[in-house]
Amino acid sequence: MRVVIQRVNKAQVTIDNEVVGKIKRGFLLLVGLREGDELDQVKKAASKIAKMRIFEDENGKTNLSLKDVNGEILSVSQFTLLANTKKGNRPSFVEAMRPPKSKELWEDFNQELENKDFHVETGEFGADMQVSLENDGPFTIVLDI
C-alpha cells in the first residue's frame, strides 16, 4: 500500500464539473493499493496517518497532528502510484490491485479514518477526476506500508 500525503490548505475533487469532495485544512491522500495488500495494511496506514505530526506548532516545529488542528481528509484512489517505470517508456501497473478488491480496501481505509473521528471526503473510485489543491508548504510524504 502506498499513500501520498499532502498537507493542504484546501482541496477538492470534481467529476463532470460537479464537486464530489471538498475539504479545508488537512490532508489530501492519494491511495494506491498493491496486489497482496490486506486489511492489516489498511489499518496500519490509517493509524500512522492519524498520528502523523506534520503541522506546525506555535514555535514553528512540525509537532501537531491532524486532530490537533481539527483537520479534514480528502481521500482519492489512485492505482497509478504503483507504476513500474524500470523498463521502457510505458509504465506497467501489474503491481496495482484490481477491482473489486481494491475498491473494497480503499473503502475500508476511509472507514478506518472515519472511525478515528476524522471528517473524510472522497473522490469516486475508478472515475476520471480533476483534483485541485492548495499545498501548504509544500509538505508531501510518501507512506509505504
UniProtKB/Swiss-Prot annotation:
Where does this polypeptide localize? Cytoplasm
The UniProt entry, under Gene3D superfamilies, shows: D-tyrosyl-tRNA(Tyr) deacylase (3.50.80.10)
Query: Which Pfam families does this UniProt record tie to the protein?
Result: Tyr_Deacylase
* Alphabetized UniProt keyword annotations: Cytoplasm, Hydrolase, RNA-binding, tRNA-binding
Q: Name one GO molecular function term.
A: Gly-tRNA(Ala) deacylase activity
Q: What is this protein called?
A: D-aminoacyl-tRNA deacylase
Q: Which InterPro entries match?
A: Daa-tRNA_deacyls_DTD (IPR003732), DTD-like_sf (IPR023509)
One GO process term, biological-process aspect: D-amino acid catabolic process
Describe the reaction catalysed, as an equation: glycyl-tRNA(Ala) + H2O = tRNA(Ala) + glycine + H(+); a D-aminoacyl-tRNA + H2O = a tRNA + a D-alpha-amino acid + H(+)
The first-level EC class reads: hydrolase
Q: Write down the species.
A: Lactobacillus gasseri (strain ATCC 33323 / DSM 20243 / BCRC 14619 / CIP 102991 / JCM 1131 / KCTC 3163 / NCIMB 11718 / NCTC 13722 / AM63)
Q: What is known of its domains?
A: A Gly-cisPro motif from one monomer fits into the active site of the other monomer to allow specific chiral rejection of L-amino acids.
Checking PANTHER family in the record gives:
D-AMINOACYL-TRNA DEACYLASE 1 (PTHR10472:SF5), D-TYROSYL-TRNA TYR DEACYLASE (PTHR10472)
Q: How does it assemble?
A: Homodimer.
Q: Which CDD domains match?
A: Dtyr_deacylase
Task: State what this protein does.
Answer: An aminoacyl-tRNA editing enzyme that deacylates mischarged D-aminoacyl-tRNAs. Also deacylates mischarged glycyl-tRNA(Ala), protecting cells against glycine mischarging by AlaRS. Acts via tRNA-based rather than protein-based catalysis; rejects L-amino acids rather than detecting D-amino acids in the active site. By recycling D-aminoacyl-tRNA to D-amino acids and free tRNA molecules, this enzyme counteracts the toxicity associated with the formation of D-aminoacyl-tRNA entities in vivo and helps enforce protein L-homochirality.
The gene name on file is: dtd
Q: Where is this motif: Gly-cisPro motif, important for rejection of L-amino acids?
A: 137-138
What is a single cellular component term in the Gene Ontology annotation? cytoplasm
Per the similarity annotation, which family is this? Answer: Belongs to the DTD family.
EC number(s)? 3.1.1.96
